[in-house]
Every structure is written in C-alpha cells, then in structure tokens.
Amino acid sequence: MKLFGTSGIRMKNLDPLIAYKVGFAISKNFKKAVIGRDTRTTGNLIESAITAGLLNGGCDVTTIGMVPTPVLGYSARDYDLGIMITASHNPPEYNGIKLFNKNGTAFDPKQEEKLEKIIANDDFNEGTWDNIGCASEDKTAVKKYSEYILQNVDIKTNFNVVVDCANAAGCVVSPNIFTEAGCKVISVNSHCDGRFVGRMPEPNETNLKETVDIIKGLNSNGRNYIGIAHDGDADRMIAIDELGRVTDFDKLLAAFCKYVVQKTGADKIVTTVDASMAIDEYLDEFGAKVIRTKIGDVAVAEELEKTGAIFGGEPSGTWIHRDIHLTPDGILSGLRVLEMMEFYGKKLCDIIDEVPSYYNMREKIACPDNLKQKVMDYISKEGKKIFEKEPETLDGVRFSFEKGWMLIRPSGTESYVRVRVEAKDEDFAEKLMENGISMVKTGISEN
C-alpha cells in the first residue's frame, strides 16, 4: 500500500501501527527528531506510536506538544528532521504525518519513496535494550518561533484583526502573536478542540460564514476590522477584507506578489501552474519574472532554493517567505498582509479591488486511477492538434493563450481529472472549458 501522497501521509482513522513503522523506518537514517502535533483527538496516539518506533530504532526524540506546522518547521533546524502530526484541512476523523528537513522544507517524493521501501522490506524487530533512543520534551518552541517572527516583521499601525484559528493548532500562536505585533485582536474559534466544534478546518467561504458575519457587524460602525483565518495546522491563511468578503486566493496572491516586488526590488517570484495570470500582468509592469512550478509546497520551496527568489506562493493560501524560513507559514503570511496594507496605506478591500478580475471555471470529471496517465497523454496530443501549439507538461497539461489558459491535471488523492480555465472574456473561458471536458471524456472512453 502506498503511504505517501501529495502532502505526506494523510488518511481517515490513521492506524498507529503505520505510525510506528514510519518512526522505525526514519530511525535508519536519522538520529535526532522533533515531533509536533495539531489538535486532532488522535494526535497523542499517533505521536506515541511514531515515538515508539523512533526510540526502538535508536533515534532520540524531542516532543514540542500541540503546535502549528510553522513552529515545527522552524524547530527542525536544531534536529536531523521534524515530524508534524496533522491532516491539515481535512475533517477531524483524519490524521497524517508530514516530514520536514533540517532547513524547514518538506520531504520530497524521493525521500518519501526511500522510506516506503524501508517500511515494505523491514521486519521492525531490530531494537535492543542498549540501542534505545532518548525521549525529551521542549516547552519553549512556541516562544522561540514567536520571538523570531516578531523580530522579522515591521508593523507600526495598530490594525484591527479578527483571528479565526478553527479550534486548531493556530490557537497556541496566532492570537498572541498578532497582539504582540500591536494589533487589536478579537479571536474566534481560538480554543483547542480536535473535533473542530466552531468550524471545519478548511478556510473557505462556507466555513467562514460566522466569522464574516462578525466582521460585518464590527465594521458597521466603521471599525475596519479584517480577518485572518487558518486551516488545521496554520501553514495556510486566507484574509477577509473590511467589507466582509473572503478574499479570492488568486487575487490576494497577486496583490502580495506585487507588494514583494515593489518593496524589495525582487526580480522574480515563484508560483504554481494553477495560479492566476493576474500575477504575470502585475509583475510585467516591474520587469519581474514569474517562475511557475509544480503544485505543492515542496516544489515551490525547491524552486526558491534553486533560483534564489525571495517569495513563493500557491493560490491555496500556502505561502513561503524564504527570507524567514522555508516552511509554509500562514501566521507569518497574515502578518505580512498587514505589512502590505501599511506599505500602500490602503484598506485590504481597496488593494484587492485593484487586481484584475478574470473569468474562472473549474470542473472535475470522474476517471479511474489506472487510466489517468493514458488520458493525460491523449490530451497532450489532441490539444496540440486543436490549439496548434505545444502544451506545457510541467504538472498536468497546460495550454496558454494571450486571452487565457487551461490546465488539465489528474487529482493526486481522488479518482478525478480536474479542468481549470481562466480567461479575459467569458466566451473564451467557456470555449476552453468545452474543449477541456471533451478531451478528458474522449480520452477516458478511448482507453
């Protein structure tokens, strides 16, 4: 059974035996590990199991308790690797394991494949009494992380901020760090509860309805509150503007990319193949290059290291600030949105409204997993004939045009092929989507 997916191990009712085996496999090549966990009810169970495997294999283990992923990623610099027990935005019955290198980057597919081979081939009975690792606890991780982040943000304005932590790991950091940064903070869903009683951890418009209503109520008297909302492990964030609008992920990313280039003079930024062409349009004005990479924080971090770009972000709200660290950080990202507002001297709603609006369409077509590659091969060849141009095949199949683009990509976690279209006019968007759906369905039927 394949364990690692697009973001570590993540599954419903994660078996502690799997966690034990992962820990034991890690101990083959690493001798000093740090472990953090989010608020899920199975967190202690999975932490204990993976710790047992590590100790049995002779790896020393330090636990730092309930923390967001950015805290774990920052802490990893003092160890051989970091282990985060989280299922991110998934419902409470899920849990997972995500591994981080010493530099804060998540394990890449080659590293995960190496672990999978060890797990598949090992008997897990090699531990002996004279080669057991040492276990310890560090209660200072949150303090160290918070101090480091606050040293590297510069906010002089006393912003009004509603922080929504989803009863998840962000609770132990975000309300305090925004307060220490000088903000007037109202915290929502800010007590830790692995059942996510306030809202589900995916920070989307549906789940954030109550938080939006709170902000609208506060701002009815001209208070100008904005919202910062996290997912289950706070490696992501989304903002809610003063009008109570959950900001479009693409628009917020485009606005922030422009800010980074204007403030720092950066000549390039990194984003993914599914990000809006508004980024290209914005940065072209400043002569900055947009480097696109595969979807996922691993690919973004790798490209940041390779190119020396200062910032990389995905339209999912996963942003990496290389000048601070290489772990996706929704807490730092929220603070830097405030820096952006201060830099421009504008409300967030006005900054967002300046970003070009395009027509976006998304569809998903059911496709058996064993046909996905054949379907993508068909789309690549057929699309070349239809559009009379070479496709981009970095991640899925993408066709770019002057007026828009289309990305067709197989889901890494579900039996679907997804079609994403963005265009400057509605007719062109609909035409692209029709072609995309037709190619996917034909590719399935002919294979």
Curated annotation (Swiss-Prot):
Keywords: Isomerase, Magnesium, Metal-binding, Phosphoprotein. Activated by phosphorylation. It catalyses: alpha-D-glucosamine 1-phosphate = D-glucosamine 6-phosphate. Its cofactor is Mg(2+). GO terms for molecular function: magnesium ion binding; phosphoglucosamine mutase activity. Mg(2+) binds at S88, D231, D233, D235. InterPro entries: A-D-PHexomutase_a/b/a-I, A-D-PHexomutase_a/b/a-I/II/III, A-D-PHexomutase_a/b/a-II, A-D-PHexomutase_a/b/a-III, A-D-PHexomutase_C, A-D-PHexomutase_C_sf, A-D-PHexomutase_CS, Alpha-D-phosphohexomutase_SF. Binds 1 Mg(2+) ion per subunit. The active site is at S88 (phosphoserine intermediate). Pfam families: PGM_PMM_I, PGM_PMM_II, PGM_PMM_III, PGM_PMM_IV. GO terms for biological process: carbohydrate metabolic process. Its EC number is 5.4.2.10. The modification Phosphoserine is found at S88. It is an enzyme of class 5 (isomerase). Catalyzes the conversion of glucosamine-6-phosphate to glucosamine-1-phosphate. Belongs to the phosphohexose mutase family. HAMAP family: GlmM_A. This is Phosphoglucosamine mutase. It comes from Methanococcus maripaludis (strain C7 / ATCC BAA-1331). The lineage of its organism: Archaea, Methanobacteriati, Methanobacteriota, Methanomada group, Methanococci. The gene is glmM.
